[in-house]
Amino acid sequence: MPELPEVETLKNSLKDKLIGLIIENVELKRDNLRYKLSPLLATEILNTNILDVRRRAKYLIIDFNNDYSLIVHLGMSGRFTLQSANYKTQKHDHVIFDLSNGEKLIFNDTRRFGMIYSFKTDLLEKEFFNDLGIEPFSDLLTLEYLKDKLQTKKIPIKNLIMDNRVIVGVGNIYASESLHLARIHPDKSGNDLRDDEIENLIKAIRDVLTKAITAGGTTLKDFVNGDNKPGYFTKQLKVYGREGQSCLSCSSTIIKIKHSGRSTFYCKTCQYS
């Protein structure tokens, strides 16, 4: 599933190309996504001007000049790409936006776990994103904030940093990578972390996410950016997906365990605490 770096990469690839364009037509090809497409989607943003393209957590947001925004979640296999005017519709295209420059913006989702909504812009944070925690790069992510969130939590730190009510956008891949960089065992209880470990973890999360964004995200199977290009952070993964291989830091063997049904990868030598 695309995480923060993938959505940030998608945003960066689309923003300059979309701002200022007009949505001339919206074609709903297939509404059989996990959350059924609303017929209003075809009319609420019709003939509107694109003001901005931004990200909140793992959501892509496109703002229009009629006080509405398009909210896109890629789910497991969603793709949101720019295509030329002569683009031929594909089997799993769900929504096609015709743009004023002749190009098409396509939402394609093979596994249909994605979602796409239109929503009043000024109500997004209050009603749509009201349960989300803070962004990893926000100044609000401090030792005091995270310590307060962790001090009563007797559950694995890996689960806690993946909780979008605490920090948004840190999915399975980047949780494993961040904990390895911070040298923290993924099973360690959140309330057992020392202050210096919490500070190291915040720094590690930011460092890993920054490197992933710079590399264009991680493509394990489906992810591509708005230009239909994959991400290359896969080549920089230190532990994720490397079960049985040597740790790149100490040569110990990478171990795979499960947390809440998800695969976790770590090094027992580097992540001793």
Curated annotation (Swiss-Prot):
Keywords: DNA damage, DNA repair, DNA-binding, Glycosidase, Hydrolase, Lyase, Metal-binding, Multifunctional enzyme, Zinc, Zinc-finger. Coiled coil: none annotated. It catalyses: Hydrolysis of DNA containing ring-opened 7-methylguanine residues, releasing 2,6-diamino-4-hydroxy-5-(N-methyl)formamidopyrimidine; 2'-deoxyribonucleotide-(2'-deoxyribose 5'-phosphate)-2'-deoxyribonucleotide-DNA = a 3'-end 2'-deoxyribonucleotide-(2,3-dehydro-2,3-deoxyribose 5'-phosphate)-DNA + a 5'-end 5'-phospho-2'-deoxyribonucleoside-DNA + H(+). Its cofactor is Zn(2+). GO terms for biological process: base-excision repair. SMART domains: Fapy_DNA_glyco, H2TH. The active site is at P2, E3, K58, R262. CDD domains: EcFpg-like_N. GO terms for molecular function: 8-oxo-7,8-dihydroguanine DNA N-glycosylase activity; class I DNA-(apurinic or apyrimidinic site) endonuclease activity; damaged DNA binding; zinc ion binding. The keyword DNA-binding applies. It holds the Pfam family H2TH. Involved in base excision repair of DNA damaged by oxidation or by mutagenic agents. Acts as a DNA glycosylase that recognizes and removes damaged bases. Has a preference for oxidized purines, such as 7,8-dihydro-8-oxoguanine (8-oxoG). Has AP (apurinic/apyrimidinic) lyase activity and introduces nicks in the DNA strand. Cleaves the DNA backbone by beta-delta elimination to generate a single-strand break at the site of the removed base with both 3'- and 5'-phosphates. Belongs to the FPG family. This is Formamidopyrimidine-DNA glycosylase. The lineage of its organism: Bacteria, Pseudomonadati, Pseudomonadota, Alphaproteobacteria, Rickettsiales.
